[in-house]
Amino acid sequence: MVLLLAARRVFMEQSSMLFQKDGKNYLQLDCENAKELSMKLGEKTYPFTKDGKKWILELPFSTAVNYVQICVDGQEVLLPELPIGHGYCHLYNYIELPDGNELTEIRDIPHGTLVHEFYMSGISNNWERFIVYLPPCVPSAGLPVLYLQHGFGESEISWTTTGKANIILDNLIEMGKIKPFALVMCDGMVKEKFGLEERLNHVLLERMLVEEIIPMVEKKYQFGGCKEKRGMAGLSMGSVQTTRTVCDHPDLFSEVGIFSGFLRDFIEGNPDRDVVDRKPYEQTHLKAMDNPAFNSYFHTFLRCIGDKDSFLPRFLAEDEIIREKGVHEIRRIYLGEHDWNVWRPCFADFAQMIFQ
């Protein structure tokens, strides 16, 4: 909040603009009194050039979604003129360039509804929130439902802000490419409460879904209700939560999507990744794949990743698990890194495979 207010003070009564010239994309900011402006993208910093009262930067990317950090005189700020998202437990501005993908465009068609639900969890001992997407023009009763999880450092809003999952489904429904289904998006960064203290514990999501959220939300909206009308998918950390949940409870799900995804849980018990002091997880959920009936559990088992994803070696190493256990999967490698430029098409493709 402080950074956002700081940005408003610096840029009050000003605007930031994206424009094209000679086939190149530029970001233009009005910040007359600043001495220096720069933009961080990953590990690199790009300085703006001052042109009169304006600061101009040729954007070093052409992909659709890009998290950036704007710095004014060395101070990182959030620009209210640009979209704000979050990842890796950090707030970012992001710049979205047109990529010709009509599935992510808001069009004059019927749109679904997003509902924010709150409840007190007996498992985390904390207030939890999840978001329900209800497709347009159809009653929720009897619909299939996909439980869709975000990645580390994100939240239940990520799939409908930066991810545009609801817009993608609206467009696919309008085009007649999918049958309508609902989404439930939970906060996978589960914060277990102990008195006044909280502790991140991603493992708890599985119990919360199975014991609390699924019974509660499916009773209220009358969707799902059986294995054939229920699926689960997630990206990055959410893929870990997905794999563990569907392997431990194959009787509950018929569709599985593992985006930039992992079969093994490399977070639990890892001293560099897990804030809970516990022994390394023994991957007991993977024993479900030893069951000869495993392939009959799921209509769709999609595993995918970007070709420049830093986790690609881990993904490729897990190919051996698939081969060894004889799992029938759909495997796709997309162009891109560990970001929304991969996860959006992952989701769009997966949506067209499931509940058919």
Tell me the role of every PLM-derived stretch.
Residues 1-11:
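Short, Lys/Arg-enriched N-terminal segments with co-localized hydrophobic residues
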Residues 13-45, 49-356:
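Non-catalytic cap/lid and distal C-terminal segments of serine-dependent acyl enzymes
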